[in-house]
Design a protein with these regions (language model features):
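Signature of multi-pass transmembrane helix bundles
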Residues: 2-4, 8-12, 19-27, 31, ...
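Residue-level signature of catalytic and energy-coupling elements of molecular machines
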Residues: 6, 50, 79, 148, ...
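Alpha-helical transmembrane segments of polytopic integral membrane proteins
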Residues: 18, 59-67, 76, 101, ...
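Membrane-water interface of transmembrane alpha-helices in multipass transporters/channels
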Residues: 34-42, 80, 216-224, 251-261, ...
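Juxtamembrane helix-boundary/capping and inter-helix hinge elements in multi-pass membrane proteins
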Residues: 71-78, 113, 171-175, 183-186, ...
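Membrane-interface alpha-helices at helix entry/exit sites of multi-pass transporters
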Residues: 77-85, 190-197, 286-302, 330-331, ...
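Transmembrane alpha-helical segments and their short flanking loops
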Residues: 113, 314-427
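Alpha-helical membrane segments and immediately flanking helix-loop junctions
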Residues: 257-313, 338-355, 378-401
């Protein structure tokens, strides 16, 4: 039986074909065939149609997913300090992660030297410079419906968090509402899957348009973008996490490094934190963490800890801003940090959702969503790397919380025994 190509394989093929066709079309003489029928017709319909479908899902998916994510955290009230410490760690490290990627993006400037402003019908709206206080005030919606209609993502996120928190507090009284939101979220996630089915066609149209109008110069910029993301992931995993673990627990990172590869192999190959949950929790228990901590922090981290994803969003936003010649300013950068950090609460582990969340961040600062088309082809490779970093963050948080709660067996942590390997050998 002939094996079907995966969506990832189809996207890679579409990117390669789009690149080749785009370069070929660029060599054609100027005229209506090239500009109107091919670039402005076929390529535009495929590329812009896909982008419009992604835009369609941004607000409803963000509202439903974040509401469900917050509403599901009802057990934080009973867990008290564990819940508070876990949330503070996850949100703080996400903010640090995106700040690192933004700094690296401005240092390396992956999008400088390539002008893509001619590829959009409307010029991007340059984010107005705002103070820190203005950004905080702008997060509060005076009219949630208007915020959704206008695509004001910071306000949509804020309302979603408050709405989800209220559902969590009321508990059983509003169980029907919670079930309705969960069903609604499932519908929107399924819609994402349906839209992603057409991703290869969209990627072909977007990549072909890019290379037909800018040439192979775009490829060099894409490599620099990948370098920013990978360097950001490396710094966050090796410096930030190691430093935080040492500062708050005085533990050596080496026992964790020795026992994490079994988890990393799963997250890297599947690009899913959820797929590695059982092995991750077993590994934490093997490292001496009490199950009452790991059974809470690991599943919660798989839901709201998206440091690797935040690094991608920060780098991609600056990359796309540079491509279109937009200076975000301090207000725009703060908006990106706030939006990506808060959005991490509702980012689901479903292929394609990361792109929807990225389009939300781009919308929050007035950048063209069309820029996503250039990075889609390499996103799968980066996704495997950033998912692994996400899981490392879950584990480091678990170790810190367990140490602070006094439920970390340090003799087990520094032990060379590998319970999982022994268990597998017995079975």
């Amino acid at each position: 039986m002939k094996k079907k190509l995966s969506l990832t394989s189809k996207i890679f093929i579409a990117m390669g074909v789009g690149l080749a066709v785009g370069v070929l079309v660029r060599s054609l003489p100027e005229g209506s065939l090239k500009d109107t029928i091919i670039i402005g017709g076929v390529f535009k319909v495929l590329g812009q149609g896909f982008i419009s479908a992604i835009k369609m899902l941004v607000v409803p998916l963000v509202f439903a997913s974040i509401t469900c994510g917050v509403a599901s955290l009802s057990n934080i009230k009973s867990l008290g300090r564990i819940g508070a410490r876990t949330l503070i760690f996850y949100l703080s490290t996400t903010a640090i992660a995106i700040s690192i990627s933004i700094g690296l993006a401005y240092l390396i400037n992956p999008g400088v030297g390539l002008d893509m402003s001619s590829l959009v019908s409307e010029q991007p709206t340059i984010a107005q410079s705002s103070s820190f206080a203005d950004v905080l005030i702008d997060m509060i919606p005076t009219n949630p419906i208007k915020a959704m209609a206008e695509g004001n993502m910071l306000q949509v996120i804020s309302f979603s968090i408050i709405f989800g928190l209220t559902i969590s507090i009321l508990g059983e009284k509003v169980k029907l509402v919670k079930n309705f939101m969960e069903n609604l979220n499932e519908i929107f996630l399924k819609m994402v899957n349906l839209v992603m089915y057409f991703a290869p066609f969209g990627v072909f149209g977007l990549i072909a348009t890019t290379f037909a109008t800018t040439g192979v110069e775009a490829f060099a910029s894409l490599l620099k973008y990948m370098a920013v993301v990978l360097l950001g992931l490396l710094i966050h995993a090796s410096v930030v996490y190691t430093g935080i673990l040492k500062i708050f627990t005085n533990l050596s990172i080496m026992p964790f490094v020795k026992k994490f590869p079994k988890v990393g192999a799963i997250t890297f190959s599947t690009a899913s934190s959820g797929a590695a949950l059982p092995v991750t929790m077993k590994t934490m228990n093997e490292l001496g963490v009490d199950s009452k901590v790991s059974s809470f922090t690991i599943p919660l981290g798989a839901t709201i800890n998206m440091d690797g994803t935040a690094i991608m969003q920060g780098a991609a936003t600056i990359f796309i801003a540079q491509l279109y010649g937009v200076d975000l300013g301090l207000g725009g950068i703060l908006t990106v940090i706030f939006t990506a950090t808060l959005a991490s609460i509702g980012t689901a582990a479903v292929p394609g959702v990361g792109l929807v969340m990225l389009s939300m961040v781009l919308n929050s600062v007035g950048l063209p969503v069309e820029g996503i088309g250039l990075i889609m082809g390499v996103d799968r490779i980066l996704d495997m790397c950033r998912t692994t970093v996400n899981t490392i963050g879950d584990c480091i948080c678990t170790l810190i919380v367990a140490k602070k709660e006094g439920v970390l067996d340090e003799s087990m942590y520094y032990s060379e025994n590998d319970m999982i390997r022994e268990e597998l050998e017995i079975n």
